[in-house]
Amino acid sequence: ELRENNGEIDAAEKHALPRLIEQRDIRGDVHMHTVATDGRNSIREMADAALERGYEYIAITDHSKNLAMTNGLDDARALEHIKRIREVDAELEGRIRVFPGIEVDILGDGELDLSNEVLAQMDVVIASVHSLFNQPEAQMTERVLRAIENPYVRILGHPTGRLLLRREAFQIDIASVIRRASELGVAVEHNAYPDRLDLCDRDLRLAKELGCKISINTDSHHTSHMEKMRYGIRQLRRAWLTKADVLNALSANEFLAALRSRP
């Protein structure tokens, strides 16, 4: 995978190539959707499928209200959803952990579309842009920077918004965003869904250089989508990422501790 003329030949000659991330290093998948919004399976079905794949944990991160086409959750429904997720987690008796989360929309001005009171109840808050993709670079950059300043955001979802062969990445100063995310203790996502593969390998390498953790997720809307993790692993390997660079290569307890350690 290391064939982009980024120092791999010199490293190989010095026997200094790193042990790159592997599929077996991933302990959980923390971006997925259920029938509560636009997914096709229940919380329990997603958890059972993840357990079959050998994962230690998942996070259920259904959409928030601004994405109306997905039947996104408002504050009241989100609180009910948290309750149900915790019930399923208890039913599974530790065989796999199921963390309550949300994929919250970043509005045009950088505000989030759920209240902080609700976000505070979530273990995993992913903030994502799903609208107004044509904002100028300076405006989009400021929008995303404002969003990740929210103290409850833990992961920036599909950070450039690209859909391969369908939509170009929006204009954003991704280096500034990644640098600030690193300072804040916010991870940036590599969305392994084949339509996205976002961040790209160049930006993943930049994140590694800036000390920003990566969360690799499948954005699954069906139990079968979890197998798409392998596509993302290939991109992480192209970017020289190791197990130490990846947030969800941590154990369940370490993962939660990392999320809760945000300054």
Feature map (PLM): residue ranges:
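Charged catalytic cores and adjacent phosphate/nucleic-acid-binding surfaces used
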Residues: 1-34, 40-60, 65-96, 108-263
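Active-site catalytic microenvironments in core metabolic enzymes, especially phosphate/sugar-handling
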Residues: 101-104, 231
